[in-house]
Amino acid sequence: MPEITLPDGSKKVFEKPVTIQEIAQSIGSGLAKATIAGKVNDVLFDATLPIDNDSKVVIITSRDKDGIEIIRHSFAHLIGHAVKQLYPNIKMAIGPVIDNGFYYDIFSEYRFTPEDLIKIENRINNLIKKNYDVEILQVTKKEAIKTFQERDETFKLRIIEEIPDEGLINLYKHEEYIDMCRGPHVPNTCHLRHFKLLKLSGSYWRGNSENESLQRIYGTAWAKEKELNDYLKRIEEAEKRDHRKLGKKHSLFHIQEESPGMIFWHPNGWTIYQVLEKYVREILNKNDYLEIKTPQAVDKSLWEKSGHWDKFREDMFTTASENRTYAIKPMNCPCHIQVFNQGLKSYKDLPIRLAEFGSCHRNEPSGALHGLMRVRNFTQDDAHIFCTEEQIQAEVSTFIDLVFEVYKTFGFDEIIIKLSTRPEKRVGSENIWDKSEEALMKALDNKSLKWVLQPGEGAFYGPKIEFSLKDCLDRVWQCGTIQVDFSMPIRLDATYIDLNNEKRNPVMLHRAILGSFERFIGILIEQYEAKFPIWLAPYQIILLSITDRNIEKCLKFNQLINSKGYRSKVDIRNEKIGYKIREATIGRIPLIAVIGDKEEQFDSVALRALDGKNLGIFKLDDLYKLMNNLIEKKGRTE
């Protein structure tokens, strides 16, 4: 007679083992119809499995976060059901849930096309309409092997081989189709309604390019039709803003096969990069950072001392010269300690803040590369603060202010903060972990900031705070971080003389605001849809001649404007002025200045904004004042 305790504290006693579906029915038929699964003593549980013992039970519907995850996982199995009906000879690999959706990796000699995707989606819709029950079979490992041997599902058999012999394996039966999963899954396809198959891509078994090539089908699913439609609109908008497309369209950068994951910056894109670097440098200078530059290639002995050789050797590019092996640096921290170590340091010298626009290389898998967002060569706005334990809180507090100042400049007002604390495997005393975690928490709390605790998610060498920004499409990008490090200063012999004239190791704070220039510029391209604010735009103003008579004045004004430090260009082609204005608008140039006979007569320009707003007639001195004001605001309206 299991006693079931519900979330409101009420209890129900049943005469025999009971399912979550039956518990829901005892509360109400409406809840029973909506029930997808449940939690039994905080463990996810299928709606149709019996509960034998006294338990705490939570009923899950599509309104719950766990509910939508279960729906998405069930849709992945539906892909398998549909694809196996349409293409019986294919083999199913894995089909997990991902952010906002799901995918299934499939081995097939036949190459799927977008037309096949439509066919598969139609078959899924037909299966959903049948409202069939999804049956769960709990079997032994031996029985699972037999099941998938009969179906010649080689990838499933490989997965089963890795499962311990003891215990039961969950198989989910969709009519004639059987798949395996930890579960839970929906009890009936009536819960599967609002979905869309999105795209095809390639992948490899276990993500290893030396293994079999697979084909991946991506999809999304939601509890309500409106949620699905809203998401599809966001996808459409994201495709329109794709930095790779806009980068090509506006000649910002390109990537080519001869140098995968490394950026060829064009003049327009490099201008944005340089303006961004100048801005960050000004921020660093205002906050007493010392800018340094360290070598690209460093003997492997330093990486062995720092511990990176053992942990990250496979991610490093290496080269050899005169019987010595060098690593192209994947990060800057060991080199910054070498700069700190030059000369004796006193506690009076601390904190010392060393910053570098450090170019790093990491041998990312080719399949993971993605435009500017995931590259092999990137530049970090990297800095390391060498300080005492007592200075951690003040340094972190100042850094938090910097992060918010910079993100606000670019229009990012919603910042998500996560604090990661000590993992099980760690270095350093409990005392210093206590002090460090308390310092980070106090720095956040003293500013009345909301933050999320991630217990055990810190690095082995110290706790950290991560700063993620939310863009105009509600996507979250983790960019900034500040990380406490007790380990590396010890490993690389960084010391200072304390108040008692004794040598001590400083604490090192790793910190970055943008993360990498490449990725941050990619985010900005998509955030602004390449309509950069005037301070950041490759060209800030374009001068258009109406007739050939106005070309000379156009060129003269252009020279004067550029001599003042603005970024200006001309369009003096023999084209109609309407066409030139459209071209300048498509080119995303913030200010468009037209010069005709009337403007030339009064030594002025007719100015319009990128959005088409007529700003009026301006003489050059007034134009400079306007541009200075817009540039100083950096696109902010307050």
Swiss-Prot record:
Binds 1 zinc ion per subunit. It is found in: Cytoplasm. Its main location: cytoplasm. It catalyses: tRNA(Thr) + L-threonine + ATP = L-threonyl-tRNA(Thr) + AMP + diphosphate + H(+). Keywords: Aminoacyl-tRNA synthetase, ATP-binding, Cytoplasm, Ligase, Metal-binding, Nucleotide-binding, Protein biosynthesis, RNA-binding, tRNA-binding, Zinc. GO terms for cellular component: cytosol. The keyword Phosphoprotein does not apply. It is an enzyme of class 6 (ligase). Its EC number is 6.1.1.3. It comes from the Bacteria. GO terms for molecular function: ATP binding; metal ion binding; threonine-tRNA ligase activity; tRNA binding. Pfam families: HGTP_anticodon, TGS, tRNA-synt_2b, tRNA_SAD. Gene3D superfamilies: 3.10.20.30, 3.30.54.20, Anticodon-binding domain, Bira Bifunctional Protein, Domain 2, Threonyl-trna Synthetase, Chain A, domain 2. Belongs to the class-II aminoacyl-tRNA synthetase family. This is Threonine--tRNA ligase. It comes from Prochlorococcus marinus subsp. pastoris (strain CCMP1986 / NIES-2087 / MED4).
